[in-house]
Amino acid sequence: MNQKTILVLLILAVITIFALVCVLLVGRGGDGGEPSQLPHCPSISPSAQPWTHPGQSQLFADLSREELTAVMRFLTQRLGPGLVDAAQAQPSDNCIFSVELQLPPKAAALAHLDRGSPPPAREALAIILFGRQPQPNVSELVVGPLPHPSYMRDVTVEHHGGPLPYHRRPVLFQEYLDIDQMIFDRELPQASGLLHHCCFYKRRGRNLVTMTTAPRGLQSGDRATWFGLYYNISGAGFFLHHVGLELLVNHKALDPAHWTIQKVFYQGRYYDSLAQLEAQFEAGLVNVVLIPDNGTGGSWSLKSPVPPGPAPPLQFYPQGPRFSVQGSRVASSLWTFSFGLGAFSGPRIFDVRFQGERLVYEISLQEALAIYGGNSPAAMTTRYVDGGFGMGKYATPLTRGVDCPYLATYVDWHFLLESRAPKTIRDAFCVFEQNQGLPLRRHHSDLYSHYFGGLAETVQVIRSMSTLLNYDYVWDMVFHPSGAIEIRFYATGYISSAFLFGATGKYGNQVSEHTLGTVHTHSAHFKVDLDIAGLENWVWAEDMVFVPMAVPWSPEHQLQRLQVTRKLLETEEQAAFLMGSATPRYLYLASNHSNKWGHPRGYRIQMLSFAGKPLPQNSSMAKGFSWERYQLAVTQRKEEEPSSSSVFNQNDPWAATVDFSDFINNETIAGKDLVAWVTAGFLHIPHAEDIPNTVTVGNGVGFFLRPYNFFDEDPSFYSADSIYFRGDQDAGACEVNPLACLPQAAACAPDLPAFSHGGFSHN
């Protein structure tokens, strides 16, 4: 081979190698190698925007930091120098417990929203604890107008018919600290021998923690609480590490020095005091079960034992978000509404409109309840009325990518509770549009003609979460393109446990060597103020019946014909359905206006609940949560019946501040402004798979509000997201099928913000 031939071959080899490299580079850019740089998707700022001008939507906006500060300053001046910061207040002190928005009267709000009248005065509601007065009491004061308050008025008598007894007040954080100090510094040393033996006791080392129960006693006027003791497991749920010791603390006295331990329960037996327990232990009369301190190992920890894997699926907005959040107002092409958070009652929405027409004045969580069973005193007496702790107060920051989609819009919440200055929960709400991965409607036709039509369901969601002791609640309000509204809550977090002893099968399941997962029910109550084509509404019940008949063309044969039954419910008693009773399968509120087909325009309430049995009515505390007895009740709307529960019901359910059953007094509901009160819940018998946490799957309940002849046809028919093509069309052409354009429209990389978390303390 001559030199010239070799040179030609070398040149050809270089060209071939260069061509192969080019092919490889192009291939890697398009088929899974190092990706070529995609353009960023167009986007609007993912954060909520502040108010740009005074507007109607601010009627329902929670108080700003500036407004909370102004109210606090005004009250401090008016109530005098005797006020103590609630963060350090003793029971014998005067303090401002809470300040939050006083909702405007509905008539005044609608006059402003619909007729352009001046907005009602913006006001705050403050709860004051007067422990230093000759007759200690709790008062409610309305302060206004905001942002520059000039008046306050005492509304305690107006709201409650008289002064509120002081024993009904919520337990302040300082009171819990004083109880802990009493238990650990004064009481537990009396049983140090037993505690060293069973529980690795370290005086002042605090390897143990307490957990409260509620209510606090056995009759009105009591303030005596069972506290369970658990290992203090850092970084994991102590709720699963019960050591078998429970203490009944009487903390009714205004001076903590006079608080006492009334009873002691240890691993299945009752004692009069810790000193008696210690004496019997020293005498060899106490059968002690040693409880290992497992630390954060095993299944108690939420830290995964496996390394991270590939990134999970991610939803994003290829052409930018299709909704906006300004202040507390959410707007999309279909839905608008205002949102907020009651300090005690939790999430709420107002002035909900679909395609510009108001459907709902208010949907608000009212109360949540967990009733426990067990063979220890703490377990058997626990009825957590969560509004008494505060479902807004104990809202938590939402973790991006876990609690909500990574690209959701996050909104802060400002509050003033047990403090002289307002605090902020960062990312307390999230708002997002979600593709459900499910068709809202579809049909594929191979019969007579060939075509496909459908619509992928995308929903607008607003979400918040509350962590109340061991449980985490997810509160969802979901808006569908069909005009339906879905309200749902989920329970997750840690179960509440008890020390395992005796015949436990009646009270739950064993979930660890010494741990009983105690049976309990979850219930939540919602206020639904529907305004269907106006304020005058009627309640209709429809169901089904089979009616026997002779077959018309063959009379000797019988046929069971399915028919619809209809009944107008005219009184509150007729529209109050007890838990477990037969409820019409279709119950809807309707106006006296008709749709195109002559039917009353209505909205149906469809339950999604498998609630446990309510507390028997002969229970001494049943009045404290009488709403739990009704799966659904419809009443006349009254300003003097704003809520079905009260922050004060937890600590005195025996003489309830608000008894919901009083709302149902057989008044007419025909052609009136109506409120539907809905209970959703479920029975939870904890099991092994609740360790370490209860999962949301199967533990979500709620209800739908669905149009029922409200429209002339399905409003989603007009959705710009609809897809339709025939068999003789090219479904891959953009002009025929918008989904065919998706490879170009969505050929962009989402602009992901840096991960952030709202933290574990509020500033």
From Swiss-Prot:
What are the glycosylated positions? N137, N232, N294, N592, N618, N666
Catalysis performed (reactions): methylamine + O2 + H2O = formaldehyde + H2O2 + NH4(+); benzylamine + O2 + H2O = benzaldehyde + H2O2 + NH4(+); 2-phenylethylamine + O2 + H2O = 2-phenylacetaldehyde + H2O2 + NH4(+)
Q: Which GO terms describe its molecular function?
A: copper ion binding; primary methylamine oxidase activity; quinone binding
InterPro entries with a match to the protein in the record: Cu_Am_Ox_Cu-bd, Cu_amine_oxidase, Cu_amine_oxidase_C, Cu_amine_oxidase_C_sf, Cu_amine_oxidase_N-reg, Cu_amine_oxidase_N2, Cu_amine_oxidase_N3
Q: Mind telling me which Pfam families this protein's record contains?
A: Cu_amine_oxid, Cu_amine_oxidN2, Cu_amine_oxidN3
Task: PTM 2',4',5'-topaquinone: list the residues.
Answer: Y471
- Residue ranges the record marks as coiled coil: none
**List of residues binding Ca(2+) 1:** D529, L530, D531, D673, L674
Q: EC annotation? A: 1.4.3.21
Q: Where are the transmembrane segments?
A: 6-26
The reply on keyword Transcription regulation is no
Annotated cofactor note:
Binds 1 copper ion per subunit. Binds 2 calcium ions per subunit.
Checking PROSITE patterns in the record gives:
COPPER_AMINE_OXID_2
**What are the subcellular locations of this protein?**
Cell membrane
Q: Name one GO cellular component term.
A: endoplasmic reticulum
| Amino acids binding Ca(2+) 2 | E572, E641, F663, N665, E667
Query: What cofactors does the UniProt entry give for this protein?
Result: Cu(2+); Ca(2+); L-topaquinone
Segments on the Cytoplasmic side according to the record's topology features: 1-5
Task: Spell out the disulfide connections.
Answer: C198-C199, C404-C430, C734-C741
Question: How the protein assembles, per its UniProt entry?
Answer: Homodimer; disulfide-linked. Probably forms heterodimers with AOC2.
Instruction: Give the UniProt family note.
Output: Belongs to the copper/topaquinone oxidase family.
State the name under which the record lists this protein.
Amine oxidase [copper-containing] 3
What does the organism's lineage look like at the top?
Eukaryota, Metazoa, Chordata, Craniata, Vertebrata
